[in-house]
């Protein structure tokens, strides 16, 4: 009971919803929710989905989830925070030159998962609205089938790739519910 009371405020939680406008700008709708349990700790989970095929030769289909635990330096939803987050991505990319060694001449169908640390800052705008800036760095493990593009019947092969670097970037509009 003592350990539980250390992390949870008996007076109630504060809840916020948000959207990351950087992902909105690349046509990936997203929504996040964050619950603060006391003055310094919160948990956040965001989901992202892009089901678009841009043309017969370009596709950026994917969905992603990102849960995160955050420690707020001053107080919840105000100022600096540090976080630890996990990430899972399921994707089907085609005809695009992407990071991680993926070439435009191929298409890729697979998933990635990993863990990361993050830093961010929430800027107070009004009692209900904030703007959040965040970046995360860490590790992602990719597993995918690689196809000749346009996609042939059989994959060229199954591949794995390890990535260390930027894993999260965000400028989010935050609405505080309670």
Stretches found by the model and what they are:
Residues 17-19, 33, 45, 67, ...:
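Membrane-embedded beta-strand positions of outer-membrane beta-barrel proteins
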Residues 48-62, 90-112, 143-162:
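Flexible, solvent-exposed loop segments that connect beta-strands
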Residues 13-62, 70:
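Start-of-domain marker
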Residues 41-43, 77, 127-131:
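Repeated loop/turn-to-beta-strand initiation elements of outer-membrane beta-barrel proteins
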């Amino acid at each position: 009971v003592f350990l539980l009371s250390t992390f949870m405020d008996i007076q109630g939680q504060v809840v916020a919803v948000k959207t990351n406008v950087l992902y909105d700008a690349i046509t990936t709708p997203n929504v996040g929710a964050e619950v603060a349990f006391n003055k310094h700790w919160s948990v956040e989970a965001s989901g992202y989905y892009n089901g678009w095929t841009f043309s017969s030769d370009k596709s950026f289909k994917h969905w992603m989830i990102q849960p995160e635990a955050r420690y707020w330096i001053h107080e919840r939803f105000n100022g600096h925070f540090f976080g630890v987050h996990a990430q899972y991505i399921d994707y089907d990319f085609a005809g695009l030159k992407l990071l991680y060694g993926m070439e435009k001449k191929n298409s890729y169908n697979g998933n990635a998962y990993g863990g990361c640390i993050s830093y961010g800052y929430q800027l107070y705008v009004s009692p209900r609205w904030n703007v959040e800036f965040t970046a995360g760095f860490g590790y992602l493990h990719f597993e995918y089938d690689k196809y000749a593009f346009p996609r042939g019947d059989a994959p060229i092969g199954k591949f794995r790739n390890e990535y260390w670097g930027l894993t999260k970037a965000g400028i989010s509009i935050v609405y505080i519910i309670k």
